């Protein structure tokens, strides 16, 4: 793993923190879901990299990626692939012990190319092969790294593996073998095998490249296609950006982008989002230009152009790429010391005798394309992935060649801070990807010696994935990563089209999309609403990752089809989360990719004049766009207060990561019992049920906001709409501001929807785990469910969820609103914290409005028209059929009472502010008068 400068504020772990046979040192990198530490072996002191992943912060798809990465790395042994030494799983974390790459990654190497001479490990390289001004790396270094990267790609190709995230950040560097040989006392790095640091290609005098991060890798035979969209945006192949099925040639495009960046110092295509990136790729017309300052040969330029073909059919094949002169030929321009020496006759004769003595081995190696492959097959035709396993494992420090890499687990301990652990690594041994496929990727039976480790129920192997398994609701991002299933493409299109609408009709500026900065206030609501997670805030500087679906015209012309697709996606997600489908009336909108930048301010934002919270006495909306914006914001505000209430429950269930308070090792063993005594199982079940129903309520309100936006967009996008005719005569500045406001709201709603859905899944897993740990006589134990209730548990995505009878989000919200309003009234009478009283009153009103909000939005019965009746009908359904008339009247009366108190409070605050301002002005006038008259009290002068 690379050594990066960390921006984390986390204190350095104690020196006695250990993971297995390794001692934790300092933190060298950090992501959204994992931290990377340097470490050393207890006995030898050899350096390693420790990637610590917190299980509680991973959704199902990220866990699949992690376990898939572990399963793949367990079998990969190649000099140019980062090796996995060990894997230690604790109660809350999974720790991957990996090879340590002290020179960092290739992106840092390219960025610091002018300062390489200052590093002892790269001083000789910079002296012998200097970089040209305003250009990339020296061509000798480019060809050297390309040969080593090709060696790793060839190794993966012959194992039917596709990496899917080849980029400079995942290409880690080590000092050259010659440098390590000459500086043995500098840093000893733990080796996974006897030839782990012996390059299979390139020059021994230059740094060694290793391919890392197999979180998106999967088994993909040469005749198969994948359709999961994942990887890093700037290095994605265009067929992935177009949501088309793709094969392993997608890696070739990524190799081409890396090669171009090494040659020029920058990526071939720069864009602020995926839509703009695809547009630039298509506009290039396969014409790849190099600047005049770029000093590379025509051979390298030709290879880049052959790799960067938009059409994968026209792209260079793997066979031609592996045999390209740049790959197979000698490196021109070498200094005399680096020119390969001719092989001695005695050594050549020895190798010849070895080949004659082992004809089978020689034939096997020739059939597998030569010396780049260091793993030797045992069987004539084994499973391609098993073919990766090498006898060289016997040289591993762990001596686990026969059984593969084992994962040590601690003794079973109750957990109160993390969701139930996913299925074991054994069950995940064939799940290398999060891609949705209808047939298992591999049907080849395991070798006999692994039968005990790979045994699983027959149903788990043969059961095909259902539609519910493909529900596109697990969206994750770590740095520049993005994962989007095919089912969610329609949901993405709605928000993407709305986000692009403000750009239409405006002059373009350099082909770039300008982002709008938004200040996010700090909530002080007593509901527990909190600002965005620091991990998300840290990512705010990144580009928005919007995607444009390949069927936008269909969406624009058929809003009914769009809403039905979104409803289906929500139902699929609810089936996977809760064990049964919620009706489309309850949840009517689907999920989009999470936005790193949230333009819609989180509730509440008292510092923003045009916030979500309003007193209901503002002037009537001017036009349709104003009414739509008001309706969307009303529902978004109600959902936000419900979300804030749910967060209070959630943060009791999932507290801060153990590594924040106790270092990477988590809670010390002697304090494990104290940490577990915080919540009883009854309390965990109660909190989980309450948080779950509140999250569902928040989802339903967010879905209604998206419903209104969908109807508004369907009219906006129709060219024959009368609105488009009248909009030409309106005030363009006011109209544009309203459209931008709606767009910001839609993007915020989509981001919040993803966050709520992910947290709901964590809560669901926590609830299932807690229910299973209850005594069998407990009413909430799974064995005590009524027979008619068990019929609801038809979930294919996991164990179904059965909340207790009587748990109601409306009841919880009503009690919370009453409690908040009473507390605010007491503080108001005592004249304490009047601004806080105002926030509490407003929050209580919004929460009661959410209680009155109807869950019966009969979406299929709606008729799309050119008027705003749809939004009015949605906003007018404020009475739930599940509530009695007396209950409705009681809630409405409570809303009126709180509004009355709120009006009086605001008048009082205004009076106090006016009096204070008048008093200040009077004091200032008195000071001015005294100064003019000279009546100023002289200061005493010390004698």
From Swiss-Prot:
Q: Which residues bind ATP?
A: 28-36, 51
Any one Pfam family here would be ATG1-like_MIT2
What segments bear the compositional bias annotation Polar residues?
A: 517-529
UniProt topology in membrane: Peripheral membrane protein
Where is the stretch described as Disordered?
Answer: 334-468, 503-561, 774-800, 858-888, 914-943
User: Any idea where this protein resides?
Assistant: Cytoplasm; Preautophagosomal structure membrane
What domain of life does the UniProt record list for this protein's source? Answer: Eukaryota
Identify the EC number(s).
2.7.11.1
User: Can you state which reaction this protein catalyses?
Assistant: L-seryl-[protein] + ATP = O-phospho-L-seryl-[protein] + ADP + H(+); L-threonyl-[protein] + ATP = O-phospho-L-threonyl-[protein] + ADP + H(+)
Read off the PROSITE patterns from this record.
PROTEIN_KINASE_ATP (PS00107), PROTEIN_KINASE_DOM (PS50011), PROTEIN_KINASE_ST (PS00108)
Name the GO cellular-component terms: Atg1/ULK1 kinase complex; autophagosome membrane; cytosol; phagophore; phagophore assembly site membrane; vacuole-isolation membrane contact site
Q: Please name the GO terms of the biological process aspect recorded for this protein, alphabetically.
A: autophagy of mitochondrion; cellular response to nitrogen starvation; cellular response to potassium ion starvation; piecemeal microautophagy of the nucleus; protein localization to phagophore assembly site; protein transport; regulation of autophagy; reticulophagy
Write out the entry's keywords from A to Z: ATP-binding, Autophagy, Cytoplasm, Kinase, Membrane, Nucleotide-binding, Protein transport, Serine/threonine-protein kinase, Transferase, Transport
Key word Kinase present: yes
Top-rank EC class of the record's enzyme: transferase
Q: What does this protein do?
A: Serine/threonine protein kinase involved in the cytoplasm to vacuole transport (Cvt) and found to be essential in autophagy, where it is required for the formation of autophagosomes. Involved in the clearance of protein aggregates which cannot be efficiently cleared by the proteasome. Required for selective autophagic degradation of the nucleus (nucleophagy) as well as for mitophagy which contributes to regulate mitochondrial quantity and quality by eliminating the mitochondria to a basal level to fulfill cellular energy requirements and preventing excess ROS production.
Subunit details = Homodimer. Forms a ternary complex with ATG13 and ATG17.
Q: Which family does it belong to?
A: Belongs to the protein kinase superfamily. Ser/Thr protein kinase family. APG1/unc-51/ULK1 subfamily.
Put simply, this protein is called Serine/threonine-protein kinase ATG1
Q: What gene does the UniProt entry assign to this protein?
A: ATG1
